[in-house]
């Protein structure tokens, strides 16, 4: 997507490194503490990759990202929960805006929620994103809920999310 001149924005708690050390999007130079965003350094890149560690306020950050996705529909805007169950802190945003805004106000939004879930050694509460709650909110094609099984699935899901001609929230 970056090589096709699309912008990508990711925010959430510890997203630069990834809670499970799965991303390493920002590297620090040991001597100078300079931060290097590798995805903005590769040749042929046209778009901008912005990644921001956020404060521990899911409600505020998801609200900001929802507004950002609304104001900048040409940017793939992603909010990642540090653990899947952390979406609880933003439940009002999910209920009132993410799942219902198109029906209520006839506005579309393409915000992507990444909700890590699985047994990562952090205990039962952190191990479930409670996807069943998102499935219960699905009605009249108001959002997409997906559980990818391969990296290729994930790539094509994000690509489709950004390249289609309408916007709908995506929960992964």
Where are these regions (language model features)?
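Non-catalytic terminal/interface segments that mediate subunit docking, oligomerization
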Residues: 1-74, 81-102
């Amino acid at each position: 997507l970056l090589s096709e001149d699309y912008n990508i924005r990711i925010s959430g708690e510890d997203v630069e490194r990834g809670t499970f050390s799965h991303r390493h999007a920002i590297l620090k130079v040991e001597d100078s503490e300079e931060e290097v965003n590798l995805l903005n350094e590769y040749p042929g890149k046209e778009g901008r990759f912005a990644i921001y560690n956020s404060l521990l306020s899911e409600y505020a950050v998801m609200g900001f990202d929802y507004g950002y996705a609304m104001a900048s529909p040409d940017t793939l805007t992603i909010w990642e929960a540090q653990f899947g169950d952390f979406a609880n802190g933003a439940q009002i945003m999910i209920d009132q805006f993410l799942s219902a805004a198109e029906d209520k106000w006839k506005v579309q939004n393409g915000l992507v929620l990444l909700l890590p879930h699985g047994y990562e050694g952090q205990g039962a509460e952190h191990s479930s994103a409670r996807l069943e709650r998102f499935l219960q909110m699905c009605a009249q094609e108001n959002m997409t809920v997906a559980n990818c099984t391969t990296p290729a699935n994930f790539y094509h899901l994000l690509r489709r999310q950004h390249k289609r001609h309408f916007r709908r929230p995506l929960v992964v």
